[in-house]
């Protein structure tokens, strides 16, 4: 039971109990555990000593006296946004973005080569916490347009089998297709898979043999599992401004792809390498 598990956690060697579901209830369980001898006085003192030692090492007692334990937001932003840190972010993006596989002669992209672009934006819904950065698709679309590309956002049409728009409406209109996938795992969602739009998987990449297609994942590096036939695939691993700017530089040939796969983006599947 939780009543026993709470004190047994400390007795087993954990010094601090975090992420309590109900602090009053868990406090009472802890107190009863001490009274019942589940947590011995020796173990209690050991845990408290370690906790206080950590706080002392962090000088929290001094910061509490000065009122600086929680920094003022303005001061924090001054530290977080200094040029040295921004330079680190740019360097990290430049060195990490990975061209996982490439169809010959698709890259680099330029407005002269691909004037009209069809843009597919696949992203998670906003939630409470641990969620993806919202609006990445809008940001990247504007970046493409700023370079001179004409970009249309894909919107699924209403219809059903036999009544959808003709294939040639896309293949005869667009010079390039770009998928930007912004899906991210979080604490209680350990698997992320692409869920295709209705009707009938309207945004599935089916024009790859007719229109050059580039797929970009800005978070999860394993999406080839769901789109193995995509011939040009890029992982950026993050969606901040520095990553998006570096991505565009590399797509347009102004910077080389330097990243080396830190994981297996092919997911041990033979068809993802085709």
Place the predicted regions along the sequence by residue.
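Preference for extracellular/luminal or secreted protein segments
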Residues: 2-274
């Amino acid at each position: 039971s939780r009543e026993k598990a709470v004190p047994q956690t400390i007795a087993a060697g954990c010094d601090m109990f975090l992420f309590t579901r109900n602090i009053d209830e868990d406090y009472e369980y802890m107190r009863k555990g001490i009274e019942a001898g589940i947590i011995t006085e020796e173990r209690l003192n050991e845990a408290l000593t370690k906790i206080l030692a950590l706080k002392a090492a962090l000088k929290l007692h001094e910061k509490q006296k000065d009122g600086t334990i929680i920094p003022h937001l303005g001061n924090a932003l001054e530290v977080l946004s200094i040029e040295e840190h921004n330079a680190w972010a740019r360097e990290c993006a430049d060195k990490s973005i990975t061209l996982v596989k490439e169809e010959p002669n698709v890259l680099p992209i330029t407005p002269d080569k691909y004037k009209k672009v069809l843009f597919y934006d696949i992203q998670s819904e906003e939630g409470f916490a641990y969620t993806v950065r919202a609006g990445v698709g809008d940001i990247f679309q504007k970046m493409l347009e700023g370079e001179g590309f004409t970009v249309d956002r894909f919107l699924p049409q209403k219809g059903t089998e036999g009544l959808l728009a003709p294939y040639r409406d896309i293949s005869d209109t667009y010079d390039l297709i770009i998928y930007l996938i912004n899906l991210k795992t979080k604490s209680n969602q350990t698997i992320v898979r692409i869920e295709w739009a209705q009707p009938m998987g309207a945004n599935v990449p089916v024009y790859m043999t007719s229109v050059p297609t580039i797929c970009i994942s800005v978070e999860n590096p394993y999406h080839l599992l769901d789109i193995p036939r995509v011939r040009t695939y890029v992982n950026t691993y993050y969606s901040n401004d520095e990553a998006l700017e570096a991505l565009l530089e590399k797509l347009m040939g102004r910077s080389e792809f330097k990243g080396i796969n830190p994981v297996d983006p092919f997911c041990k599947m033979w068809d993802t390498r085709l």
